[in-house]
Amino acid sequence: MEKLSYKTLENVGYDGYLLKDAKEKVLQFGEGNFLRAFVDYWFDLANEKADWNGKCCLVQPIAPGLAEMINEQDGLYTLHLRGSVNGEKVDDKRIISSVSRCLNPYQEEGFNEMMKVAASDDLEIIVSNTTEAGIHYDPSCQFEDKPAASFPGKLTQVLYHRYKNNKPGILMLACELIDNNGKELLKCVNQYIEQWNLEEGFKKYVNEECTFCGSLVDRIVPGRIRDPQEVARLEEENHYADPLTDVGEVFGLWVIEGDEKLNDVLPFKKAGLIDKVFVTPDMSPYKKRKVRILNGAHTGFVLGAYLAGQNIVRDCMHDEVIKGFMNKMLYDEVIPTLTLDKNDLLNFAKAVSDRFNNPFVDHELMSISLNSTSKWKARVMPSFLGYIDEHHALPKCITTSFAFYIQFYRGYELTDAGLVAKRPVGNTYTISDDRDILEFYYNHKDDSVKDLVHAVCTNTSFWGQDLTQIAGFEDAVVQTLTEIEEKGTYEVMKECL
């Protein structure tokens, strides 16, 4: 069967939206599943809805990559956005035509083409998602390298070439999942300017004429379809083969931190995507919303749900007690501590239920349980402390989630793989966390409930503070943990409702 290309689509009589030729307005570092299901999708919608008439030229950030495959398909690929919307199963298919080509800068021709795009009058935006490890300063990179090994090194080379060609400053959108991604990237570029002794005029160009924006990205992207039968079925339906087929969830949100005038460059407001992709002077409330509601919900209920016999998130959403516990925690104890518009928070929480109920994604509770100690501190504890400040009382569900956390970590055997514990339904499971945390729980495996709770609550290396100083908390956790031993986590959840 013919691979996806403009010619193939013409041959099969495809009549959906396509943009074959347009200016390369975006240089994108990263060609993986996430960016193609997220950034390139939004630009594709902007082309259709706002007549933006722009293409994204992709760059492989590391030597092994997809450039050859992408170019073989004229930059085209099929995107499936799958999930649940208001409880209804959704599978939206779209051919994305916002990508012009993909360059491999580790080949001479690819490097030269990257520099040509850098100096182009058409270029307006640079986007990156080079993984959490991508934004780092590597002093071994040299200006003469073709290319510099690190992404910030490559970006410095690109910006310098643009500067030397007297082209205007650029808008830089960092999508990496680290705090202050835009600022951290700019910091790395400035380090290379110093290391490579580049002129003061270029430093001024980077820091004053270019705009480095942080951004918050939110979409789960499972990536390619692995089931050969489904691949065969889709090829039959589409009348073409597409090894670059990508899958993401329906929900998507891109919050870009910066001045309102960025909307003069970005096409998303004009395209009517303002609730999905928008500019805000401060993205921290949106980050807090995601961490506390989406991630906090996961950490708050999954350990108790796993001990109650569940294995995947979706099944938890079909259990009235577990879902009820999650909702009570979110609506009564988490949302009241957040400062964004109330309707905005409620809509986000409602979307979380749909996302957790995704019929296409088997999200395992055990995968979410990884590093639950630091997750509880980062995702749940701020809501816990905020609730206490406001109400001068303990939040019942969050306090219960802390007891679930301790119960989950009550292992009996320490191995190289982790701390082994036994589930009430009979099977064993292995807890994954920092070694010192696992050793702590192993060393306290024979403690009484009272002693264990005291040891956990007073471990300031876990929580950054002594939790026994919070009035009534230690006693409440002891009581809840005792009830868990007697009745199990499911009954304890039920009693919270």
Q: What annotation goes with each model-predicted range?
A:
Residues 1-497:
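Substrate/ligand-engaging "lid" and interaction regions
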